[in-house]
Amino acid sequence: MKKLVSLCLALAMLATIFAVPAFAAEDKPYAGVKLTYWVKLHENLDAAKVTNMAQTRWYEAVKEATGIEIEFIHPAAGQDGTEFNLLTAVPDEMPDIVEYSWTAYPGGASAAIDDEVIISLNDVIASGKAPHLKAILDNEVAIDKAVKTADGDYYVFPFLRGTTFEDNNCLFTSGFYMRGDILKELGLEVPETIDEWDAVLRAVKAAHPDMIPFITRTEWMNQIFTPGYDNYWDYYVEDGVVKNGLVEDSHFEYLKKMASWYADGLIDPDYLTHTKAGDGRGIMAAGNAFATYDACGGGASNIFPYLLEAGLISDESDMVTTVPVTSVKGQNAKFSKMNGLYDASGSSAAISKRLADEGGEKFEAAVYLLDWMYSDEGHMINCFGIEGESYNMVDGYPTFTDVVLHNPDGLNVAAALSLYARGHQNGPVVQDTRVNDQYYSYSAQVAGMKLWTKTDFGKYMYPAGAAIATDNADDFATITANIKTYKDEHEAKWITGQEELTEDAWNAYVAQMEAFGLSRAIQYKQAAYDAFMAN
């Protein structure tokens, strides 16, 4: 039944994405054309001992399907930002295609176009040369707006986490994990609301006084529990009005709860030191914590095996997950930690102005190649790899083979799949929920792919493409920096009890936020949102 539901959802998605005739791949109109493609080598490929994407079966499949040859250029590990800056400093020497997070370019994508680093794709799309991408843009207004600059320029062949917010597990990469065996021991249900979390953590503390009831990274602490108060930790949109949850009364209530949890030993006393990925994970893996919030892949795979090996849990099913914290049990959380459909922080592919100026067959081939990635054939190769090798069609459902799930060379699923596909990485692709349905092996991960979607945040998410006007950018940046510093300092003091959180203290805090210019920042965000929606 699960596969049938997933199949129906996937077919509906594919019908939307690929609502144009597929290219006749056998014609290969640009066979033999060679393109240069600058892209960061994904860490999963590094784990598979691959030094260039040309060594992958994915590339072999792309080359076979399109006839186009690609010379991949990879920046040195950890140097992609530096090398990107050097690359874009000399536009006349740019590779044909550059894959990067173009919102990170100084001044954003608009500046990259103005600086003649990349091109506006408006003419390409309007002329019908990118029919598969255009089909997505025509059918999905939110995506269409997100992948344009404030000036209305399309600028990338985007990395998309699906095309809808509904039942889309591609939008979630992390969630709660907890010891189900301890819940069973204490006769408790998996918590959903703040009150239920409070009861569970207190029961765990009483029964296991040497165990930390909850542990996670510093930055995630308020992102995962504020939704229990219908509060968001940043800018959001409600009925067309931009708001910021940091100064709402609901955030005050959240902070009071966190302060009580800290005082009563319910959260890690050293949580402020856990500032990067993996921090505190060892405590959970050693059985010294009851619950955590962590990455679906790296978190579970670095916690569950150690608990099993140490005999702290008898079966991996002893680890369980739950929905995003909600204010009303059984209802979707208003907010949650969730990615957008267009992940501007991920890398998407742009065509260099140099190549466009040269024109001719190479330029046409670059457009063809990148648009082909959104075709039915391109989608299947990007997400599943090669039929008969990395996956088989079973009752109409693309099912990964043991080459991916139980790799004979000992590669984990992420590394093995990286040899055949790109959909779980970045680039000009649309992710497919059917990948996540099979990608994870632990029952808590599989359940998380369903449970973590129980949120309505898609209705309130501030669009990533709504950029602050250039004239306001410096002032907005100053306000943002001041607010973040002040927020981090005071929230840490209140939660850890260094300062008492009273109504007077809270009111003074809100007043200082206003003095920093929060209302002005909200006005800037509102103007950007209005322009974005009107575009």
Walk through the language-model features, giving the residues of each:
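Structured mid-domain segments that build the active-site/substrate or prosthetic-cofactor binding neighborhood
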Residues: 288-354, 358-415
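Conserved small-residue motifs centered on glycine
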Residues: 372, 376-496
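Sec-dependent N-terminal signal peptides of Gram-positive bacterial secreted proteins and lipoproteins
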Residues: 4-23
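General small-molecule cofactor/ligand-binding pocket signal
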Residues: 69-75, 269-270, 320-325
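Helix-loop-helix "hinge/cap" segment bordering the ligand-binding cleft or interdomain interface
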Residues: 122-128, 152-154, 158-221, 236-295, ...
